[in-house]
Amino acid sequence: MSDDNLAEIRDEKAKKIQHPKGKLTAYERLNLLLDEGSFSEIDQHVTSEENPDGEAVVTGTGTIHGRPVFVFSEDFSVMGGSLGEVVAKKILKVMDHALEARAPIIGIKDSGGARIQEGISSLYGYAQIFKKNVEASGKIPQISVVVGPSAGGAVYSPALTDFIFQVQDIGQLYAVSYTHLTLPTKRIV
């Protein structure tokens, strides 16, 4: 199966989840952002055992008005866009490429936060991403585009970037949900 076919199959599955919510897929977002035909995916075949067809992030490079950029687009249709060890490694790799090329990094955020099933390794992944955000600060432009939830650990990386754009009525940034505050204490906050 070719890389294009794999991406197409994955995107068709994602459309069934995202479109009813009024949201685009990770690939659709990248295709709208980047110059037509310029997207080149990085690490498409890097997956975890839980998600052999693709992980909760699409990473790569492309151009905007002919200028090179590096991108990652979180995929909420795969485990709620949650960050686990493999997702973190893919994001860190594309951030490293951006630093080496002295090109902007654009993160399209649509994530329920840490992949709790993976325990501490998902939190370590966030720590590494935050460290990379700080390392890149003042060296390359870092841009966050919030197109869905950015919960828990997923909220801190955008706060460390240079610019944050948020889709009205759909994009959300929060460290903890209302349910997480009220459920354990049984108190109205």
Set out the residue ranges of the language-model regions:
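Terminal-region recognition feature
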Residues: M1-I143, P149, A154-Y156, L160-Q172, ...
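Conserved small/polar residues in nucleotide/adenosyl-binding loops
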Residues: T179-T185
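Short hydrophobic transmembrane-like helices used for membrane targeting/insertion
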Residues: I188-V189
